[in-house]
Amino acid sequence: MTEPAYYNRSLDQGLKQFLSNANDMVSELKNDGYRISDSCRFSVFIKKLSNFIENGFEIGDRQFDIALLAEGSRDFAELRAIVKSKTVRQKNRKEIQKIFGGSGKPSDDTLTQSRDFQFELYLAAIFDLSGFYVSIIEPDFLFKYEEVTYSVAAKRINSEQKIHTRFSKAKKQIKKSGINGFIAFSLDRIVWDKMKKDPYIITNNLDTLYNAGQTILHDLLKTKVKKAAWANRDPLVVGHIASLTIPAILARSISFGFSSNQLFIPSFDISEKSKIYRHIKELPQKIKWPIKSQ
């Protein structure tokens, strides 16, 4: 595969401010008519975080599930983008309602639909909040750059064995739309499973977030992902967007960290002299989310 163009942004936020924002998001969604039960993973996270703060637990305390907190912080960081995006909110009411299912940790999910929808909506929200014109239609959404419209089929991949299957389905969706498009895919679950670690890191330096999982990510891109991309070549599939989101606990400041990574990769047959190739290389520079002030 062609060398990817990167977008990466890492942010952190104190636990009390994060909790306040999480409560505000849930209240806003409930007021808008969404059903969010006390047993929902987002509600459970709020209870766990409140308990953590009130009881003065420390990072590494064995009586507290830090992995659950870290995963919840990633869920809320992604939900924040979805809530902020008017385009996504207006067009995806049924899909947004479905993301409130699922378990606190992805490894405990028996069904993946909730987090699958979460990734699709989160990616669409990123483009919308970055100033792109976004339409929520098949395959998953469209965006426009320099008056050129691209389609996106977004797939969350839960195992290496499913990479080819998910790419094949995405290709069919793009072909059905008839619009040049990207196969976008989340490798969060695969990367962390291969690391054989909890889905977070503890650090005092936000810069280390960028390096977490990068070796495994690039190995996947050069092997299993490259093989699946080659097998699913099509004139309408002009590129791929690899996504990796990393939650962290910043021990010294007792805060949550969050690193959002998107890698834009031109397809094999795209000429380096073409407008499409230039667009793919420029797109990471146009992504503006997450923004700390929001």
Protein language model regions, located:
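Compositionally biased, intrinsically disordered low-complexity regions enriched in proline and serine
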Residues: 7-8, 133, 146, 151, ...
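Conserved catalytic cores of phosphodiester-cleaving nucleases, focusing on short active-site segments
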Residues: 127, 141-143, 147-160
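Short, well-structured beta-strand/strand-turn elements
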Residues: 130-142
